[in-house]
């Protein structure tokens, strides 16, 4: 490998640093590129963390998908769940029963939904990320006359574990004119922390309760499923349809919360485009530095051409020279961004400790709902994209340098 172009470019770089104007522009270019990349890394890490928190705080308590059978005589819910659980993308599936009811306690009443669950192990798993305020992790077995309620309901009715409540359940499965209304007494077995509207008015009751009192052993046409990657729900649903090979209706969480998923993509695109425009502007200053250097070194270029240097050598010299600014700015931005993300909690702790009276630190969003998560794929995209912009930006100075006529230049001296 010929290192001559690189060595000449290095010498040219150090010589131009003695020129204060060129030095100032080069420093500002590096700062612009590094700040843009630093901001890109922080923004992408925040959005990646936001996706993780959505998965934990919202998608943990919602079915990722619901399958509705069109013909229960051809397939039972047990047949479908066996097929579903053979797919690696599906973590768990079970019958989906949701009924309307009225909760009565201490002269208070509230309309709530009651939902079935079949396996306590998976209920514990999906709420495992929460703070152990209600000893939810100790829950081992639940009977058909016991219920798990949300913290919002517990607060509204002043309930605690072991309290008894009355539920009037409305069963619409029969028909509108024969709607079955029944009253039941339940013991509060445990309480889970609510994550907002999605599960604030819900109670979880064992599936055996619905089998016993509503005679729905095989008359179930809906199955809920939880996926390993909820953000790929559309693709997983299509794979399920090919696997089952029977007419079914499919729903997934994106139909109800599609705006969250699309907003993340839109915000990520806007940040990406905006900051890369800043990088492009910074690269224009690199172009000006290269052109300034070329205009001052026309005599040297002419001498090199006269002693046998070809176009490729001249182009490589100024290619290395221009890319040096972009690579240095790129690496500074990447390193500072990665270090900041990895030490984000320590930085926030330090700021909170030393700025206790600071109004900004008391009211910012990160305290409650911000997680920074580095994605290696994002780092590669940022690095390669910046280098690509740098190569394109350096094209004109390289072309200009290679077209210098040595005869015309040397005649002037």
Swiss-Prot record:
Highest taxon in the source lineage: Bacteria
Keyword hit for Transmembrane helix: yes
One GO cellular component, as annotated: plasma membrane protein complex
Keyword RNA-binding: no
One record GO biological process: lipoprotein localization to outer membrane
Record keywords, A-Z: Cell membrane, Membrane, Transmembrane, Transmembrane helix
Subcellular location(s) per record: Cell membrane
Main location: membrane
Membrane topology: Multi-pass membrane protein
Pfam families: FtsX
Signal peptide: none
Transmembrane spans: 22-42, 270-290, 312-332, 379-399
Entry similarity comment: Belongs to the ABC-4 integral membrane protein family. LolC/E subfamily.
Protein name: Uncharacterized membrane protein BUsg_286
Lineage start: Bacteria, Pseudomonadati, Pseudomonadota, Gammaproteobacteria, Enterobacterales
